[in-house]
Amino acid sequence: LQTYEEHGHLSDTFRYVVVDLCSEQYIEFSNRRKRNLYACNGTVNFFNPDTECKYTKKILYVMPNVNGKFVLIQAFRCGNKWHVVDVVFMDTTSTEDIRSSILSHESDSCVIECTDAYFPFIRELRSSTNKEIRVMKEFPDVDKRIAATSDYVKNSILFSASKVESDTEYVAFMNNLMDYNKDSETKEASAVLSGLVQFVVKLGLN
């Protein structure tokens, strides 16, 4: 398990490598970070996927339909940080797509934030998997939750540089995250990320 200092140094070093490997995406993200809610000293933080971590908790946080998007975050706990190792970011189509995405991602528990309309789907999902499936009703004022959890994101959430380079859905998720402001409709990624943070803090996993 890496110490905070070791992990921080490696993360900082890896960001410089990312500039060379995917400079176009990095410059685009950097411009967004300067004005972004989640920017800490002008940057968001990445983890080095080549560094071995002892993950102690693995969570899926899912919103089946937020502004017409199905968003899933797969987050693993490493020390006192959370690594966003994968995401699903796509138009909401069928519950079968949602089910297959949940079942194909490793986790200790899965949290689904949704309206009552998805409860029959969740009952069926629970009968078809041994995963722990938790349900949360949609938060009534997501902008307030986003604002309340943004400092935690700055300090404790690390994103995958390799996914930014290679995964179109991860890039779309990051673009959506960088473009968030409370007056826009671009809030799908922030809504789900804030839900994840609320969940881990509530359970004392922060």
Q: Over which residues does each language-model region extend?
A:
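Conserved RecA-like P-loop NTPase helicase motor core
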Residues: 1-26, 189
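Hydrophobic/aromatic beta-strand patches that form the interior of the parallel beta-sheet core
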Residues: 17-19, 60, 111, 134
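Charge-patterned, long linear interaction tracts outside catalytic cores
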Residues: 32-35, 180-206
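Mg2+-dependent endonuclease catalytic cores in nucleic-acid-processing enzymes, primarily RNase H-like
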Residues: 78-180
